[in-house]
């Protein structure tokens, strides 16, 4: 079956976006998501593995959300410093979120409509111009606010190259910026402060189940790892009302 250029282009946009959205995490990591002041937390599923890590896909419809990684174990292997002032990071995000949503609409709605209805003529070129104008505007905003966003010139250059070389990658710009920061060294306390009580209770129950699975996989019952997991589990359950 031969697919038309239009169909292949749309499939390519979707495929590149989903590929760029995928995150490889360790088994003891949590994913925190911030969306317009509201927080949620996810435990990556152990069903999807790649290169010894867990494969996590954030919600593809919420590219304007920020994503942070944090480890629930006491082992700290992050090289980046802990994020001290969340407000400095969030301050430039309002305008950037608008641009990300605009780019998503251009790629997911306007581009397919123009190609299938109007073809690949002048209208198609106009859409491409609007896409790159939006991307350049995003990058200019990021460059101006790079200090608040915790980016040096090398990091910015890497983000800019990805966004310009492949427009679907630019949709994940906010996620890539937030993933460069370590949210906190005690994610359980952070979750207790940011989540609604019922959401925190559900999160603790899910993490408790994960800890039980980790304990079952331990070969030695009294190993240092087992003792650490048991102690961590007791402290975790003690945080429930």
Across the structure, where does each feature detected by a protein language model lie?
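Coil-to-alpha-helix initiation sites in intrinsically disordered, low-complexity, charged segments
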Residues: 49, 119-123, 235
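Long, highly hydrophobic alpha-helical transmembrane signal-anchor segments
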Residues: 1-36, 112-128
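Short, aromatic- and cysteine-enriched interfacial helices/patches
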Residues: 3, 55, 237-240
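Charged, low-complexity cytosol-facing tails and large interhelical loops of integral membrane proteins
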Residues: 156-241
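Membrane-interface amphipathic/juxtamembrane segments adjacent to transmembrane helices
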Residues: 22-73
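Transmembrane helical hairpin unit
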Residues: 76-188
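Short low-polarity hydrophobic stretches
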Residues: 69-78, 103-107, 207, 211, ...
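Amphipathic coiled-coil alpha-helices
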Residues: 26, 101, 147-149, 225, ...
């Amino acid at each position: 079956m031969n697919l038309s250029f239009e169909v292949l282009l749309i499939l390519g946009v979707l495929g590149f976006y989903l590929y760029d959205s995928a995150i490889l995490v360790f088994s003891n990591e949590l994913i925190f998501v911030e969306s317009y002041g509201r927080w949620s937390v996810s435990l990556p599923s152990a069903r999807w593995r790649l290169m010894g890590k867990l494969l996590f896909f954030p919600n593809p419809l919420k590219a304007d959300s920020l994503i942070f990684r944090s480890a629930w174990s006491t082992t700290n292997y992050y090289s980046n410093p802990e994020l001290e002032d969340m407000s400095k990071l969030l301050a430039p995000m309002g305008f950037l979120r608008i641009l990300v949503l605009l780019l998503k609409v251009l790629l997911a709605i306007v581009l397919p409509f123009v190609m299938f209805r109007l073809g690949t003529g002048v209208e198609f070129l106009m859409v491409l111009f609007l896409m790159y104008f939006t991307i350049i505007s995003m990058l200019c905003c990021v460059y101006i606010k790079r200090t608040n966003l915790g980016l040096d010139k090398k990091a910015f250059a890497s983000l800019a190259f990805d966004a310009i070389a492949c427009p679907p990658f630019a949709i994940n710009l906010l996620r890539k910026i937030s993933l460069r920061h370590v949210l906190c060294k005690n994610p359980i306390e952070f979750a207790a402060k940011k989540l609604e009580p019922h959401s925190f209770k559900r999160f603790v129950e899910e993490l408790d189940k994960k800890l039980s699975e980790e304990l079952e996989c331990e070969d030695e019952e009294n190993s240092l790892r087992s003792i650490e997991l048991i102690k961590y589990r007791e402290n975790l359950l003690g945080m429930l009302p």
